[in-house]
């Protein structure tokens, strides 16, 4: 279904880490998430989300151990307002890389670099 949406020119959003983390480090990207882009020959748009002026609020925004979405939302509503920077990075064309694994590695590298430059 994701590949068909991409072929139809529609957007699909995914978080390639495939789960929640403590916000201290970028986790590994699951290559299977990019399979639909390869199948549909659709470009991938990496996006980095940086919380805080120097990406220094990542751990505050991240899910606490065992925390579910509603708990995270309620906790964040009690936090001070935080700046978020949304960085749209260089799109990745599937034909220019070695399949889904190459896309995953390139996307992760771009996002990691963007967060380090904050």
Segments from the language model and where they lie:
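Membrane-embedded segments
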Residues: 1-10
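Surface-exposed alpha-helical segments enriched in charged/polar residues
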Residues: 3-4, 35-38, 112
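Generic beta-sheet signal
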Residues: 10-16
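A cross-family acyltransferase "interaction/gating" segment
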Residues: 23-98, 105-106
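C-terminal alpha-helix
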Residues: 110-117
């Amino acid at each position: 279904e994701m590949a068909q949406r991409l072929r139809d020119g529609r957007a699909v959003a995914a978080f390639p880490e495939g789960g929640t983390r403590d916000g201290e480090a970028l986790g590994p990207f699951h290559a299977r998430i990019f399979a639909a882009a390869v199948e549909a020959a659709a470009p991938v748009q990496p996006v980095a989300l940086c919380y805080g002026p120097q990406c220094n609020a990542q751990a505050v925004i991240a899910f606490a151990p065992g925390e579910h979405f509603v708990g995270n939302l309620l906790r964040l509503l009690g936090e001070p307002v935080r700046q978020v920077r949304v960085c749209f990075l260089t799109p990745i064309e599937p034909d220019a890389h070695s399949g889904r694994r190459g896309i995953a590695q390139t996307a992760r590298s771009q996002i990691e670099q963007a967060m380090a430059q904050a």
